[in-house]
């Protein structure tokens, strides 16, 4: 049986890991990657992946620089706000001192590639890029960044066409990027439905990511090919899995590994989230 992890306590215990130059630490590294990221860390590179990313700011604000439909823009994610980044959107996180954010992404499929790009100023022109199968982003990015800093492209600010792909592995997304929203305000506005036993999706069904808010009641999580991350925000609940039971108090979290079914009983006044990212639900290109 997986043990529950109290989020804020875990962050405090690992506070030293969130200082430069590393700035991040994984709570879970299975099919779901549950990562917490500190700062400061300002970047010029843009990351591109075929999956989606969930951002939530626990402490302070951050800026996520994105290339959206051909235009560079800054998405400000403030403390307490949650945000879902669509797949195939170039993005560059800008983090500041004394901040802490949660990032959730998934293990890549064997057929998927990640990209790291530098652009010429605020244009769509690619200055430098590398494409790779991502197994450990924390260790794979640093050598690519160092390669760029020692490159002729960095020195001259001009791309080398011979080192750029004629066609990228996949087209960039044409979706509009949503605005971040206050998680607390969203939950409060739906409290009546949640406490009546209705579970609600924060982002709808047009993404492979499902962030579901749950109030009081019980539900059975079927055996899935993906992990499920549970985060108890208010009240209490009880999870039974593999014949064992674990109690969740406010701010406790629990990872249900792929291949396990579970029963989740939530007491009156309970508010909790469940998060899944299923690549089998990848949406058509767009």
Swiss-Prot record:
Major place of localization? cytoplasm
| Cytoplasm listed as a keyword | yes
In short, the EC number is 1.13.11.6
Positions binding substrate in this chain are 53, 95, 105
Q: List the subcellular locations.
A: Cytoplasm, Cytosol
The reactions it catalyses are: 3-hydroxyanthranilate + O2 = (2Z,4Z)-2-amino-3-carboxymuconate 6-semialdehyde
Which parts of the sequence bind Fe cation? 47, 53, 91
Q: Name one GO molecular function term.
A: oxygen binding
Keywords on record:
Cytoplasm, Dioxygenase, Iron, Metal-binding, Oxidoreductase, Pyridine nucleotide biosynthesis
Segments for region (Domain B)? 178-286
A cellular component annotation (GO) from this entry: cytosol
Region feature Linker, mapped onto this chain: 161-177
Q: Which residues bind O2?
A: 43
> Residues annotated as region Domain A (catalytic)?
1-160
Q: In which pathway does it act?
A: Cofactor biosynthesis; NAD(+) biosynthesis; quinolinate from L-kynurenine: step 3/3
Q: Which domain of life is it from?
A: Eukaryota
Cofactor(s) needed, names only, are:
Fe(2+)
Function recorded in the entry: Catalyzes the oxidative ring opening of 3-hydroxyanthranilate to 2-amino-3-carboxymuconate semialdehyde, which spontaneously cyclizes to quinolinate.
Question: Which family does this protein fall into?
Answer: Belongs to the 3-HAO family.
| Name of the protein in its database record | 3-hydroxyanthranilate 3,4-dioxygenase
Organism name: Rattus norvegicus (Rat)
Name of the gene encoding the protein in the UniProt record = Haao
């Amino acid at each position: 049986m997986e043990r529950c992890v109290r989020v804020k306590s875990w962050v405090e215990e690992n506070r030293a890991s969130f200082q430069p130059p590393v700035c991040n630490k994984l709570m879970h590294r299975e099919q779901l990657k549950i990562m917490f990221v500190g700062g400061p860390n300002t970047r010029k590179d843009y990351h591109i992946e075929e999956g989606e990313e969930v951002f939530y700011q626990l402490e302070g604000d951050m800026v996520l620089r994105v290339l959206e439909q051909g235009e560079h823009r800054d998405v400000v994610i403030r403390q307490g706000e949650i945000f879902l980044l669509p797949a195939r959107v170039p993005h560059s996180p800008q983090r500041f001192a004394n901040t802490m954010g949660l990032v959730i992404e998934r293990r890549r499929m064997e057929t998927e590639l990640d990209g790291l790009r530098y652009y010429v100023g605020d244009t769509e022109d690619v200055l430098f890029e590398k494409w790779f199968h991502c197994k450990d982003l924390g260790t794979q990015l640093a050598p690519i960044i160092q390669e760029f800093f020692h490159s002729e492209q960095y020195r001259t600010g001009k791309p080398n066409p011979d080192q750029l792909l004629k066609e990228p592995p996949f087209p960039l997304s044409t979706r509009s990027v949503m605005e971040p929203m206050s998680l607390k305000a969203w939950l409060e506005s739906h409290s009546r439905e949640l406490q009546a036993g209705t579970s609600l999706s924060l982002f709808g069904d047009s993404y492979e990511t499902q962030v579901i808010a749950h109030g009081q009641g019980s539900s059975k999580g079927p055996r899935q090919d993906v992990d499920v991350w549970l985060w108890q925000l208010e009240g209490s609940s009880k999870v039974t899995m593999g014949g064992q039971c674990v109690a969740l108090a406010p701010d406790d979290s629990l990872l249900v590994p792929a291949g396990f079914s579970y029963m989740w009983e939530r007491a009156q006044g309970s508010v909790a989230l469940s998060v899944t990212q299923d690549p089998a639900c990848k949406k058509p290109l767009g």
